[in-house]
Amino acid sequence: MDASADSPPVRRLADWEHDRLGALADRYGTPLYVLDLARVRENYRRFAAAFPDAHVMYAAKAHTGRAVLETLLSVGADIECAARGELQRAIDAGADPDTLQYTAVNPPAADLDYAADLGADHSGLTITAGARDTFDRLADRGYDGRVAIRVNPGIGTGHHEKVATGKDAKFGIPAEQVTDVAADVADRFELVGLHSHVGSGVLQDDLDDHCRAIERVAGLARDVEREVGDLEFLDIGGGFGVPYREDEPPLEMEVVGERVRAAAGELGAQLALEPGRYVVADAELILTRVNTIKQAPSATVVGVDASLATLLRPAMFEAYHPIRNVTAPGRKSEPVSVGGPCCTSADVFCTDRPIARPEREDLLAIGNAGAYGYELASQFHSQPRPAEVAVDGGKTSVVRRRETLDDVTHGEQEF
């Protein structure tokens, strides 16, 4: 039986079974994504327990793997999607289209076509838009069903400027325009909610700013209700983080739940949330093999077979991911820089990081790879994407096979 709300609030690399990781690497090769589905369930249940009266959806963008979606659907989660591909993947995994929420951000025509057609057959689908223009485009397609307005409260929080969504961001209707837009939208659609998402990677020290944003959005919801009538829900998005650094404490979810509900205040609308990173980040790691040790003038450089094509976040966001020597965690630590085989100086996972002294053929683990890990993986340098193996108790299964060179070129045609 799974642990639930009382499961450990954080999973460090040292908590993984190193012998099992070594066996997985030997059997399936490296680089390798290893996903723990029991941990996915634990994280979702812990989050949902902190918001017992709320509608808790999973933000599919964090990890759209079928194994993840099926696992979360099995414990009662609904799915929030940000693109037609995510809608299709959720449906393929068994989601009822009437329970889905589609959040449209500058949506391509094909995405709006798909969503409008889906809504014509499934009246429970909710489409969220953050631009008046998007509502016009939906109306042009004959859609008049359930919609929510994404608002921009003018406050952004998060672990990096590229994920904070403040007043000048591309997301949402500016606060001062919301009531006017709501009146127009309510005349043409079934307006059921207000939506906001103001950042990512929010930890305990960020709660004050995050709650100020929630207070602002809740105030806008009350303004809208005075203008057009009751709303069904107020969706405050996700953004709840996990500790990537070993000395960072995890969120105290009971406190988070209390703070968020207090910030939202008295509402007739149901509170809704969309955790993504919180659910999957520490449920997955990457195994990578050391292939090169080089003594540079100012550092020891450790070359591995994973790269920014395997995990983009360090290059894209300067993100910190914990790294551990699985082969010999007890060796004396020394500062090393770990990088992959790509021909760019951005292909570095850490610089001068103390790690148990790596040797060639050692197995390293890169932690917290479950959120925006495989989602951002690419075929840069024509590298096949890695396999993904899921574990669940004693069961192990390949849920994404390792790509081959034929997979890299299969879509190409002669000129």
In which residue ranges do the predicted regions lie?
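A cross-domain feature marking catalytic cores of carbohydrate-active enzymes
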Residues: 58-62, 81, 104, 129-131, ...
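Charged (often Lys/Glu-rich) extended helix/loop segments that serve as interaction or gating elements
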Residues: 269-415
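Alpha-helical scaffolding segments of alpha/beta enzyme cores, especially the outer helices
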Residues: 42, 46-49, 67, 71-74, ...
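Conserved, mostly hydrophobic/aromatic
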Residues: 40, 61, 72, 83, ...
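Active-site loop/helix belt of alpha/beta enzymes
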Residues: 2-5, 143, 153-292
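Structural preference for beta-strand elements that scaffold enzyme active sites
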Residues: 55-57, 78, 97-101, 124-126, ...
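Active-site-adjacent beta->alpha loops and helix N-cap segments on the catalytic face
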Residues: 133-146
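A charged N-terminal "starter" segment
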Residues: 1-129, 143-144, 395, 403-406, ...
